[in-house]
Curated annotation (Swiss-Prot):
Belongs to the class I-like SAM-binding methyltransferase superfamily. TrmB family. Its EC number is 2.1.1.33. Pathway: tRNA modification; N(7)-methylguanine-tRNA biosynthesis. It comes from Alkaliphilus oremlandii (strain OhILAs). Substrate binds at K121, D153, T190, E191, Y192, E193. The lineage of its organism: Bacteria, Bacillati, Bacillota, Clostridia, Peptostreptococcales. The keyword Nucleus does not apply. PANTHER family: 3-DEOXY-D-MANNO-OCTULOSONIC-ACID TRANSFERASE/TRNA GUANINE-N 7 - -METHYLTRANSFERASE, PENTACOTRIPEPTIDE-REPEAT REGION OF PRORP DOMAIN-CONTAINING PROTEIN. This is tRNA (guanine-N(7)-)-methyltransferase.
Amino acid sequence: MRVRNISNAKELLKEYKEYVAAPQLFKEQWHTYFENQNPIHIEIGMGKGQFIRTLAKLNPNINYIGLEKVEELVLKSVRSIEAEEICNISLINWNAVKLEEILGEGEIERIYLNFSDPWPKARHDKRRLTHHGFLDIYQKLLKDHGEIHLKTDSKALFEFSLEQFTQKNFTLVEVIEDLHGSTDKEIAKTEYEEKFIAEGKPIYKCIARIE
């Protein structure tokens, strides 16, 4: 994804109440931030944020956290959130490798991983967001019976992820190898997803649950 550089993006972000500049201050306290006890779902690598904004509007009784390491993408999304007046979402400019610095054990009910970088070279497998190193972190952060929802256009990443989930004793609740070819029940789609659908590319999806 090509992103136009905005030199003062970090300063501009601070103007928006939906942006959390110091998320580590809310570790184990996110219900205090949202001022309610609603479930918390997080999307890791939200890109421009279309997917998580759609979910937030559809599910006002769920709190959403959008995490993205590229400042310019966070800025684009937070502007849309303000324009659409969405109240149950916060955005973080953060790297997934530091998740445990901002989230407490059992604080999250669902994690979304949408079209994450597949890191195709074998020597980079530890960077994949479904590598067992990341799964160890997710298992700490998720509540009992918490879920990971994965969507990808990469068959290799999908197969790798299924293997990793199985090795870490997740239950595979749903495994679909052509999501939009079999059914188009997915209401919330990412920008990438819409592009791939238009090109006729299959989308792979799975839901993995902690039992």
